[in-house]
Amino acid sequence: MEIDLNADLGEGYGPWRMGDDEAMMSLISSANIACGFHAGDPLIMDRTVRLAIEGGVDVGAHVGFPDRQGFGRRFMQVDIPDLTAMVTYQLGALAGIARAHGRRVTHMSFHGALGNRAAADPAWATPLLKAIAAFDPNLIISTSSSQAIEGAAAAFGLPVGVSFLADRAYDDQGLLVSRGLPGAVIHDEAQVLARVRRLLTEGTIVTHAGNVLPMQPRSILVHGDTPGAVALTQRLRAEIESLGGRIVPISQQLGFSTVP
């Protein structure tokens, strides 16, 4: 059993740092790097790419709304042509830095409110995925379970790696529950580990409403800004390996190169 372990990193700004990127990088196989809109800046992006290369970790773009104040978790009503340009801009920024270091961006994921809207609304997912395919038809779409995103990716020939968010609750449609609802974010470490164990052994999760939902992800996501993220990731990795799993990035699972 091969499973990717990924985390959202590079989410500081200027002199301010969020999370322990160095420690996380030693535990994961793929990094989703903020591209300067919800968080990050050119220097942090460059530093995080270098950390990923040193750790043998895949470089991925984590794109969001232009909302540093709200950390990209507030919905913004943006005209679709403007939004696709913003996404392309973020992809290009990270791709340029990665290329300067001899690496390519292997995957991308949507952050926060942008990801939630795209996952729930084909009218957003379709033009966004079309723009991504125009930028790089081999860019892997790392996404939580979403018919809208997965369907649009298939329509434009983009590879997909479904990611399970270990510390987030899901609804009965397989979408993430709003952070504003009680129980949407799971803080109990034992519960997080139990969810991952069930997923890997039974191929199912229990939804926020208490129903059983099948899920077959290629990746498990840990939020780097979560308190205790490093310790949790250490235990998650140990749990995966104890079940016979191998930590392998999505690019290797799908046979894609990490060099330009």
From Swiss-Prot:
Keyword Mitochondrion assigned: no
Signal peptide limits: none
Reaction(s) catalysed (UniProt annotation): 5-oxo-L-proline + ATP + 2 H2O = L-glutamate + ADP + phosphate + H(+)
Top-level taxon in the UniProt lineage: Bacteria
InterPro entries: Glyco_hydro/deAcase_b/a-brl (IPR011330), LamB/YcsF/PxpA-like (IPR005501)
The EC number(s) this enzyme carries: 3.5.2.9
Pfam families: LamB_YcsF
Keyword Hydrolase among record annotations: yes
Keywords, alphabetical: ATP-binding, Hydrolase, Nucleotide-binding, Plasmid
GO MF assignments: 5-oxoprolinase (ATP-hydrolyzing) activity; ATP binding
GO terms of biological process kind: carbohydrate metabolic process
Subunit details: Forms a complex composed of PxpA, PxpB and PxpC.
UniProt xrefs under HAMAP family: PxpA
Purpose of the protein: Catalyzes the cleavage of 5-oxoproline to form L-glutamate coupled to the hydrolysis of ATP to ADP and inorganic phosphate.
Family: Belongs to the LamB/PxpA family.
Protein name: 5-oxoprolinase subunit A 2
Source organism of this protein record: Ralstonia nicotianae (strain ATCC BAA-1114 / GMI1000) (Ralstonia solanacearum)
Protein's gene: pxpA2
